């Protein structure tokens, strides 16, 4: 396994070197930048023995993550990343492979990413699913949203390759997600299997996208019915009527967690666009466009630098931004209105040259390039690779 991981790192490094002249050209190098960013992740976060990644760079053996539901688990497990950041490797590789169909990334998927992902897989508890930490450690919580992101990627990989293994895995993950649906609050998916105290947009919005995509690749109408039901539940329970954006969660006592995150509204934008494609019902398209305008107003800031034409992504969780970008791209596939795609492209072009990206190929969180992070999170890097790859696919199709 050590030789395999090092071989992958060398192959990607060689690919980056061979593409380096193109990377210097602005606006048309999305694929090269995606490859270079993924290569930097392997170099800086990869392990020499196992197909796993560290959570941060530089490595911090005292790190305590803040996104779990269990403080004790956050104290105990530090050597490798948790599932959520690791799963970004699956999203990034799937997007890069989709953009160019380079067989090298099929090899990366099968030789590094999938073997690493299987180290989080828990078949002891039923239904089987991915745990938040390695299956060699004490049993850890299992999050419905973490598993949804993985199931989405396997569904996309099946669409890309028609390899039945990917569809089988996508369906297996969905069975776990279904176990997290009940009639508390009227319907909806919980956030965490072990902490069923509320239902979150981050489970239900991508849950709708996920099951809509399962319908797209299987034709099973039960998936479409579930996609619509999850979508309607989320709109009814978690949408802010004043601006159309989405709150974070609803507790079982009815309390609304009113924080607004880019990925939540972005996933409802993607769900709206997908459901329009699948049903032809105009109200879904109207809602997707409404959300696109609201996201552009709320999650982009007016530019402060001279010469910028478009609004700038607000600082914060870069992966949240990447998930929102999926929604803009889904809508673009319907109406081909470039205004939001051009804004995303300008942000990605600026990020490459304005100091957001450092000499080691890793990115900070500030899209203006003015603030640097001493510790760089794994998922931020995979999110950047994914965004460049998704824009590269648009380049290839035009």
Please place each PLM-identified region on the residue numbering.
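Extended ligand-binding groove/face enriched in aromatic
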Residues: 106-217, 221-225
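Bacterial Sec-dependent N-terminal signal peptides
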Residues: 1-28
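Active-site cradle of extracellular carbohydrate-active enzymes
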Residues: 202-207, 211-215, 223-275
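The core hydrophobic/aromatic register in alpha-helical repeat solenoids, strongest
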Residues: 93-96, 154-157, 211-214, 272-275, ...
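Amphipathic alpha-helical segments of tetratricopeptide repeats
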Residues: 118, 178-179, 216, 235-236, ...
């Amino acid at each position: 396994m050590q030789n395999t991981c090092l071989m992958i790192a060398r192959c990607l490094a060689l690919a980056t070197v061979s593409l380096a002249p193109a990377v210097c050209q602005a606006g048309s190098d999305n694929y090269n930048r995606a490859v270079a960013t993924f290569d930097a992740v392997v170099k800086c976060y990869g392990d020499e023995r196992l197909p796993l990644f560290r959570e941060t760079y530089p490595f911090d053996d005292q790190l305590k993550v803040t996104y779990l539901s269990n403080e004790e688990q956050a104290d105990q497990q530090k050597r490798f990343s948790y599932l959520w950041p690791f799963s970004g490797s699956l999203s990034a590789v799937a997007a890069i492979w989709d953009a160019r169909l380079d067989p090298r990334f099929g090899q990366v998927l099968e030789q590094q990413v999938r073997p690493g992902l299987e180290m989080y897989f828990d078949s002891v508890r039923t239904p089987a699913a991915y745990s938040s930490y390695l299956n060699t450690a004490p049993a850890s919580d299992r999050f419905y949203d973490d598993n949804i992101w993985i199931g989405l990627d396997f569904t996309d990989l099946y669409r890309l390759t028609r390899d039945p293994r990917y569809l089988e895995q996508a369906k297996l993950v969905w069975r776990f997600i279904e176990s997290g649906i009940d009639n508390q609050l009227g319907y909806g998916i919980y956030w965490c299997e072990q902490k069923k105290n509320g239902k979150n947009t981050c489970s239900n919005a991508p849950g709708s996208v996920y099951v809509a995509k399962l319908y797209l690749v299987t034709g099973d109408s039960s998936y479409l019915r579930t996609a619509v039901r999850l979508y309607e539940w989320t709109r009814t329970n978690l949408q802010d009527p004043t601006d159309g954006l989405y709150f974070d969660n609803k507790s079982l006592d009815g309390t609304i967690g009113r924080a607004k995150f880019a990925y939540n509204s972005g996933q409802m934008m993607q769900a709206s666009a997908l459901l329009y494609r699948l049903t032809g019902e105009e109200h879904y398209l109207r809602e997707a466009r409404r959300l696109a305008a609201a996201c552009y107003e709320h999650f982009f800031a007016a530019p402060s630098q001279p010469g910028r034409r478009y609004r700038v992504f607000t600082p914060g969780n870069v992966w949240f931004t990447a998930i929102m970008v999926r929604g803009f791209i889904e809508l673009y596939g319907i109406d081909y209105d470039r205004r939001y795609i051009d804004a995303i492209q300008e942000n990605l072009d600026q990020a490459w040259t304005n100091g957001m990206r450092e000499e080691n190929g890793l990115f900070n969180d500030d899209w203006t390039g003015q603030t640097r992070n001493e510790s760089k999170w794994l998922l931020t890097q995979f999110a950047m690779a994914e965004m460049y790859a998704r824009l590269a696919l648009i380049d290839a199709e035009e």
